[in-house]
Amino acid sequence: MSQSNSHGQSNLAKFAFNIYGTLSTNSSTPQSHEISPSSSLSSSRSKKQTSQYNTQDTNNNRLSYYCDKEIISLSQLNCSLSIGGYSGDLQHHVVIGGKNYLRLLCVSESQQRIISGINLLESKSIYNSRAPNKLINVNTIKTFADTIATGLSNGVVSIYKISPNGQSKVTGKYSDHNRTINSLDFIESENQLLSGSQDGTIKLWDLRSSSTKPVMTVQANLHSDPIRACQYSPHSAVRNKICVLSVHDSGALCKFDLRTKSGGKVYSPEKKWNLHTGPALSLHIHPEKELVVTGGRDKRISIFNYGERQSRNTPQNLINTYGPVVKVRWSTYTNTEETAEEFEENKQAKPNTLYNYDIACSYLNDDPTITIYNLGRKFIPKQIIHSKKPIQNFIWARNETRSRKIWTISKSSTFSSYNLDRLEDSDVSRPIEDLNNIAMTWNNNNDFCAVSQARYDYDLETYENGINETTEENFDAERNYSLGNEELIHSQANSLTASPVDKPQLTRSLTFNPASSFSTFSPVLVARAATGFLQNDSATSSSSIPNMQVSSSRPKLTRNTSQTTQDSSSSQFASVLPPPSASQTYSSPQYKKNNPPRFMNNPAYVIPVSIPIPANDEYVFRKLSSESLVSTPDGFTLVDVCLLNASVAASVGNNRTSQIWRLLAVSIQEEFESGIEPRRIYAFQPEAINKLPQDVQETSTNANDTLHAETTNSNFVESFKSTSTSGSQFGKQSDKDERKLQSKNSSGNLMDMINKANRTNSFSATSFKFKEQERKEDESQKAQSIKDENERASIHSKSAPISISSHPEDLDDENMGSNNSAALKFSPPSVGVSIPSTRIISSSLASSPKSVRGPSGVKSHISRSRPSPPVQTWLKQKNLEVSNGSAMASTSGLSLTLKRNKTNEEGDQLTKAWKFKSLLRKSLDYATLQGDIIFCSTAALLFYDIVPEIISQFECLEWLGIYIEVLQRKRLFVNAINVIKCATADIQEKLQKLYCQDLSLRFYCSNCQALLVNEKSKFSGKGEFGYWYCDECSKLQSQCVYCNEPCKGLAVTVGLKCGHHGHFGCLKEWFIEDQNTECPGGCGYQII
C-alpha cells in the first residue's frame, strides 16, 4: 500500500513540475538530490543490483537489457573507454535515464553484448548537501565526446565527465528554468550547451564559466509558448551565425540567431513558420543540408528548408502518418551501402540528398511501433519495427560497420537494439514487400486507373539531372531511329497478312508517363506475325543503335485479341525490336549484367481506362439514393414504403429492382395481413395406397359420385404431369364456373397480384413481429387438423370410380397458364397414380394420338363415356400390381420436388417457398452478387430491426459502410448523413465512430500566406479574437464589399466569378430592398 502511494505521489510531483515548475526559483544550487562521493566502479552494492535486476538477451544477435526502474530518456556516448577485465577498446556506449535512474552501459565492438554498467548517480560530486535525497527524473540526455548533459524535470541541468578508465564525476549543475527541460544540445564543442524548457525559454550555458547563470535567454513570444525541442544548426556556421531551431506547442517552427545585439535576452525569433495545426513535439536537422524534419500531434511529418534564400512558408515535403508523432529522427548513415541487397539498380549514391537518408518516427498513445520512411516513396513505410510494449524513446546508433541500427527503450523498462539491414529479424517488417506491382482503383465517374511500378524502383532522380546527362545527339539518334522504324512498318503494311485465326496481339502504344516528355519516348510497338515474332537478327539490338538506352523503355503491355479487333488494320503493323524473353526480364540479373545501367529509373506509369457501364449511371445513382425511402414515415407502412421504392426504381428503368420491391410488398401483405393461415404440404403417406380400389367403375348415376369421379380424375391427370404445377378443384360446379369466368378476365398469376396490391389492409412495422409470432403459434395447433383432412380426402378419392375423358385436350388454350396458377392456389395437395411420361393414349374422337401430359385444370371437360381399351387395360394392370404389393404407386412431380427441398425425411412440414423471409434473403444474395449496394443498404435499413435472423449485424455494417463511402466520394453528404440517422441504435453508434469525426480546418492569410494562429492577440486580450485578421502582416482578411467593414463570422459571396463577399444584411439591403442586379463592388457582374 505504501509503495502504491509513493508511486502515485511521484507521478503527481512530475505532473506538478510540468505545469507549475519549482516553487522557489532564487536558489542557484540544485535542490533535487544529494549524491555520496563514492566511485561507481568500486561499489559492490551497485554491482549486486546490476546482477540482480538487469539481464541481457543476445538471442538472434539482438542486444537487449532490462532496467529495474522506469526509463524515459536515451542517448549514445561516443568515446574510448578501457574497462577493467576487458582487453578491447570500447567506442560506443549507451546512456539511459529515468526516475532515480542514470546508467552508462559499455557495449562491445560488435554491439551484441554489454560489458559493464556504470551508475552515474553514484558519481563523485562537489555539490554536497545535508538535505535528504529527493526525486530525480531525467527527462532528456545529450552527449558530446566524454561529456554527458542531463535535463531534469525540476529544471536543473547536470553535467557529467567520463574518464578513460570508466570513472565519472559531476562537474556542474545549472538551474535557471522554472519547468521541465525537454531538450538539450551542444554548440560545436562540449563547452557551450543549449537547453529548451517547458517554460518557453531557450538558455545558452557556458560550461567553462563558474557562474551558474545562463549567457543568453531566448523566447519566442512575450508569453510562455512551451518548447518541445531545440537544436543547433551546424550548416549556418559558414555565414558566421549561431542558428538555433525550436518547435513549440503552438505548432510553430522558430529560427533564432544567437549573435544578436539585443543583449542577453531575445524575445522574438528571426523567422517563424506555422507547420502544424497542433503541438509540434520533435525536430531534427538534416546531416548535410539546411533541412529540418518536424513531427507533431496532427499526425504529420514536415520537411522544411530553413535556409536564407528560401521564401516559401509551407513544407517542402509532407508525410502523413497513422498516429501523433512524438519523436522524429534522420538516419545517421546514408543508404548507399544497403542498396546492394534491396535496391539492385542503384549502385551509386543519388544526387538528391533527401533520398539518401531515412526518417524514423515513434508515436504517442502507447503505440509499439517505429516507422521508417524514405522521401523517394513517402506514402508507404520502408520498414516498421514492432515491439511487444509501447516505445518510449529511440535513437539512430553509430557503429563501426555503418549499418542501420536503432536503439529503443520501451515502457516495460527494456533497452533493445534493432538492425534494419538484417532480413532475418522477424520484428522488422517491410510493407513494400507485401504490396503488388500493379494496383487499380475506381473514381467517381465509374472509370478506373491501373498503376504499374517496379517494387524497388521508387527513388527517382530529378528530371533536370536526367536531362543534363542525356545529350542532344542521343535524342536525335533515337528520334531518327524511331522514324526509320515507322517507315519500315509502313513499307511492310501491304506485305503483312494475317489469318483470321492467328492475329498479332494488341500492344500498348502510349501510357501516361510524366517523365517521358523530358528524357524518353514512348515504347515502340511490338507485334507478332502469324506464327510468332518477326524474324530479326541480333544486329537490330541496342548495340547497333548509337547512344540508345534500351533499358529506358518499360516492358510492353499486351492483351488478348477479341472478335472486335480481328479486322483491325493497326494490328498488322510490327516493330523490328523483339521484347525481352522470359529469362531476360528487366529485373533479372542476367539482363542487368548484359545492359548498361540506366541514367534514370523508370517511374510508375498510369493506365486510365474508361468503361461505360449502364448499371453505374450517375443520374440513376443520384435518383435512387435521394428518393428511395430508408425509413417508414408517419402514416406509412412497410408495404407502402416497398411500393414507393418500386416506383422510384421503375422511373429510372430498373425494372427488376422494381419488381423485387413489389414482390416483397405482396409477400408481406399476403403472409402477415390476409388472415389466411399459410398452407402446409405434407409428405406422401405410403399406407394410403393400400386402400386403392381393385376395379375401375365405368359410369356413375349419382350426382355425388359424379363429383367424386371428376375430382379423382382431375387428381389422376395432374399426377400425369410431373412438371406441372396445377392441381384439382374441390367445390360446387357453380364455383368452378365462377372461377372459370375470372380466369378469362385475368391471368391469375403472381405479377397481377403484385400490380394490384392493396394498401388498405397494410400493416405497420411495429405489428410485424407480433403477427408473425401469432401465426407461428396457430400453425402448430392446426397442423393435425390439416393432416387429417388430407388423409380423409385421399382415402375418399379412392372409393369412387375413375373416368378418363375421351375428349382431346386443348393444348393451345390461352388460359392454360392462368388455370394452372389458380389451381395451385386453391386446390389442396392430392395423391394419385402417375403414368410414365412416354406413354401415348389414343382418343376415340381424335385422329392422332395425344399425350396424357396435356393441361387439365378448371376448364377440363370430364366425359362419362367409357375409357379407351388401352387405358382400361393399363389401369387394371396397375391396380393389380398395387393390390398384390408388387409395386408402389409413385408420387407426383410436384410432391417429388417439394420432398427434395425438405430438411427432414421423417415427414416434417414444408413451408411456402415464396415466404417473405425467403424472398428477402434470395433478393439480398442476388443484389450482393450484382453489386447493387443501394438495394442492399435500403433493405438493411428497413428490415434489419424486423428480421435480424435474415440480415446479420456484420452484413448490415458492411453494406452501410460501403454505401456511405460511395455517397461521400460522390459528394452526396446529405444522403450519407441520412443513412446514418435512419440506422438502428447499435448500428448507428458504430457508424458514427467511423464517419462522423470532427474536422480540423486550417486558415491561411490571403496576403502573406501564413497560417492564421493569432497567438499574440489570443493572449493579449485586446479586442475581439478571431481569424478575420493576421498577426503576422497586421492586415484584415476580408471586408464587406458594401460597408467596407471586416466580415466576422458568416459572410455571403456575391458570385464565384467576381469573388466579392459581404455581410448578409448589407447584401440583402443592396439586392432585395434597393433591387440592384449588379455587384456592389463595381466589377459589373450581373447576378440575374
From Swiss-Prot:
WD repeat copies, ranges: 131-170, 176-215, 222-266, 275-314, 367-417, 432-473, 502-546, 631-671
Top-rank taxon: Eukaryota
Biased composition (Low complexity): 27-44, 561-572
Annotated localization: Vacuole
SMART domains xref list: WD40 (SM00320)
Keywords noted in UniProt: Metal-binding, Repeat, Vacuole, WD repeat, Zinc, Zinc-finger
InterPro entries, per database record: WD40/YVTN_repeat-like_dom_sf (IPR015943), WD40_repeat_CS (IPR019775), WD40_repeat_dom_sf (IPR036322), WD40_rpt (IPR001680), WDR24 (IPR037590), WDR59_RTC1-like_RING_Znf (IPR049566), Znf_RING (IPR001841)
Segments of skewed composition (Polar residues): 537-560, 582-593, 709-732, 796-806
Region (Disordered): 26-56, 537-597, 709-751, 764-829, 844-871
Zinc finger (RING-type): 1040-1083
Disulphide bridges: none
Keyword Kinase: no
Stretches with biased composition (Basic and acidic residues): 769-794
Keyword Metal-binding: yes
GO biological process, one term: positive regulation of TORC1 signaling
Molecular function per GO: zinc ion binding
Function of the molecule: May be involved in a process influencing telomere capping.
Family named by the database record: Belongs to the WD repeat RTC1 family.
Name of the protein in question: Restriction of telomere capping protein 1
The gene coding this protein: RTC1
